[in-house]
Amino acid sequence: MCDQGELCVGGSVCDETQRKCVCAAGHRVRRDTCVLNGNSSSAIGEECAGSAGSKCEGGAECREQRCACPPGETNENGYCTKLERSRFSTYRPPTPAAFADRCPLPEQPTRCQLPDCFCSRNGREPPPGIPLEKLPQIVVLTFDDPVNDKSMRDYRHLFQDFRLVNPNGCPMKATFFVSHEWTNYDAVQWIAEQGHELASNSISHRVLSGANWTEWLAEMDGQRQIMAKFANVNEAEIVGMRAPQLGLGGDVQFLMARSSGFLYDNTISADPGIDGAPYWPHTLDFAVPYRCENDYCPRVSIPGMWALPMNVFHGTTEFLRSPMLQGMLVGNETADHVLYFLFRNFNRAYTQNRAPYILNLNAEFLQSHGGVGMRALENFLGLMTQYPDVYFLTMRELVEWMRAPQSVDQLAQKGRCPQFTYAAPSAAPTCRQPNKCMYQTPGLGSKEHQFLTCNRCPMTYPWTNNPMGATF
């Protein structure tokens, strides 16, 4: 009952007429949470039936009629993980005493060597060992913000209807920086099952500049936990992050990322100029090699942490520039105009130093002004398939390429596709009819939140400091 103003739990909301907690249409209460009729998935430790993993949540598998984590993984809050969260949940690094040194190359080559360290004095030099003409031009498609019905129409179109492959026959994959609020986790699970990369974009999507260590950890690692729990994805494979709204957090952000199991960050904006050669990824062992126009850029040495800079896009003049493609639209563009600046910025890398061309996309860019962004992107992708030396990789694959660079010829001869599958091998396929979880959230700006998941609904709406949606 909710006749005295009580908040409902378990994915239900208060029916103001009946004054009682109700689930979404077609749902019933099972073990105190709302479950879609016909959905019989089981949590870790519960009984299961059918082939291994077919009825289990959270990356578990069905063994001896009971859901259990695979060997080498442990149950953490209802999902299986290889991460030892106790290592970093309360860890606080000492305050470094000095700024990072300038890159010591080429005079002292032993101080920074691949695979764990890479730098150059001007930030524009590619990894050594491959002639420029043999370097592949790597292109990365990244998508920002929530994953829901609004954005999934475009994602399914791009990766189901508009099938494109790399020169070696491998399908093009993308990286999705997912934020929590308004995200549906059955859709996130579908993205992972298609072989795309998932990365963290925070829970609340609020700017975290000036936030402390605990706040950064709660937002970025918390979102990683939410995706593992409610999208049945392998938490250990979520190794990338991008700060919400590109709000840098200084040394705290990057120290937290490195110590809590993140491999790379894609937040720092770098402006090479309208015709300048763009900047290459680098580790933070040494000082950032480009001008940092933000007070919250990293200043100290963070060995092994990869920074993948967002090279600023330029329009036809110096005055139109942005790290996100949405910022390049002013309202009167045609698809041909957008294609022009996509191709112009691509050539800035392709004709000079082959630095990775990272496209920072979101649903707003694809759908604005009658969909000019989507039409331009389709045309751009079609043009890219005509280049024998252009390869589309995920961010994770880009870092792996940086750690062990390969020439165009080597990529073309690979016996397997350079892609990653982020769904746990024992996870069930994305369900056709997910559970709809509804919550009253008077303290979050919107009085009600809801999301879809193939798993059972949590007791309360997942949020910072409570990513599992538990009751206390």
Question: Which role fits each region the language model picked out?
Answer:
Residues C34-V35, C80-T81, R153-Y155, L320-S322:
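Short coil/turn segments at secondary-structure boundaries
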Residues C417-W463:
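Extended, charge-rich low-complexity interaction segments
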Residues P281-E333, V338, N345-A349:
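Aromatic-lined glycan-binding groove of carbohydrate-active enzymes
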Residues L208-A211, I274-H282:
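Short, charged, surface-exposed secondary-structure boundary motifs
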Residues M1-S89:
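Conserved N-terminal segment of EGF-like repeats
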Residues M395-F420, R432-P434, M438:
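C-terminal regions of proteins
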Residues S204-T214, P323:
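Surface-exposed, active-site-proximal loop segments in enzymatic domains
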Residues Y91, P96-E197, S204-V207, E219-G249, ...:
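Active-site beta->alpha N-cap acidic-glycine motif
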